[in-house]
């Protein structure tokens, strides 16, 4: 694989100033986690990158829903700033439900007007998971304001079906990660949604869903973790774990890697990555086994960021003073 200035030149008999012999190992595109709440790991984005990079993750689509509910715009700004020095790409979605429900007491409120302001003010990839499916289906005025944006709109619609599902999709929602069985996943694919098969700490849906994926609908499936604890990431990885589990279930390995990289990139309009091909970003995973459990090298933009399970970069953190001391207890 020839690389120059972080871009893949091609595959063939190339000579370079620096060469690495991978000794017959497998070479794959960097993995994409299509939906995660970094706060669930209990670490900052800059430290999170050190957790997942050795496991081959080079791009993450993160929804900072939890910190937004506590610290509002200040929390969002911290997450964006703290991720800037990460060698992996952390793309943030703007949380769409702050508070999560109208009955919650939260530290902030992001309504339709503020949503539009924040989308124009900061570099958000799109709108985070729309949990208020009832509001979408019934055309709630404030929800409609939030959906009136030219960007990716993540979904959250457990067990939604029939005409209600159709109405939800008409709101411009493009994906869902809440499927719990094959029937639900296939109905949502038929309705035009992309499906992120989730394998996290609390919710583990891969076993129940991987059978729904066929060669015909493969482009509509990718992987995500949603919420995964640090100790589990250290033990088994994130997207690499999805690859392993899928292969153990008898799933085609090439299709598993496609879901782990190319599909997730395309679904999130990241057309410059997801393949070992000319003019793509040199995000590359070198693994000694097909199940991606013995990852030897991880490259981001052509630079070595992890080797043999160890990161090759230091953590650079943003100033966190605006998002600390946020627990307030009423005086007795």
Give residue spans per PLM region.
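Divalent metal-coordination and catalytic microenvironments
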Residues: 1, 6, 24, 35, ...
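Active-site microenvironment of metallo-dependent hydrolases
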Residues: 4, 12, 53-54, 234-250, ...
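Active-site neighborhood of phospho(di)ester-bond hydrolases with catalytic His/Asp-centered motifs
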Residues: 28-35, 62-65, 93, 128, ...
